[in-house]
């Protein structure tokens, strides 16, 4: 198309790859659910996102499948967000502040192929 400034589609997966390429050694710092501070680089994050995408593919996940997440903001959820999107699947994030009944309804309605959660949500 004429008039477009970009030469490729703007995809979520390209964001982490751009960061890994142009800011490889910059740190991502977050506090894990368990308490300690977690530090690693954009390069390491991109590698882990690709590994997650490959693992989900080997488990039979296909483009368009829905992958559910119930997690607090942290490095693991970041990796899920970018890893799932990079393989063409849908990252279905759930709000941890919803009631148990609401979460059950939403999970069943979405028909998530896989579901990831932080241990703080496991009874």
Predicted features along the sequence, with ranges:
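A detector for short, charged/polar N-terminal pre-domain segments
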Residues: 1-6
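Conserved phosphate-coordination/catalytic loops
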Residues: 10, 43-47, 97, 116-119
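Structured loop/turn residues at beta-strand edges in well-structured enzyme cores
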Residues: 10, 21, 62, 108-110
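Structural core segment of the AMP-binding/adenylate-forming
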Residues: 15-17, 58-59, 86-123
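Conserved AMP-binding/adenylate-forming core of the ANL superfamily
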Residues: 28-82, 99-104, 108
């Amino acid at each position: 198309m004429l008039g477009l400034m970009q030469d490729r589609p703007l995809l979520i997966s390209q964001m982490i790859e751009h960061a890994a390429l142009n800011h490889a050694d910059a740190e991502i710092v977050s506090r894990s659910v368990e308490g300690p501070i977690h530090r690693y680089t954009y390069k390491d994050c991109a590698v882990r996102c690709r590994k997650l995408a490959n693992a989900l593919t080997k488990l039979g996940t296909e483009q368009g499948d829905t992958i559910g997440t119930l997690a607090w903001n942290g490095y693991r959820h970041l990796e899920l967000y970018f890893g799932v999107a990079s393989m063409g699947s849908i990252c279905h994030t759930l709000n941890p502040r919803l009631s148990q009944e609401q979460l059950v309804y939403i999970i069943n309605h979405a028909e998530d192929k896989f579901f990831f959660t932080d241990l703080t949500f496991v009874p």
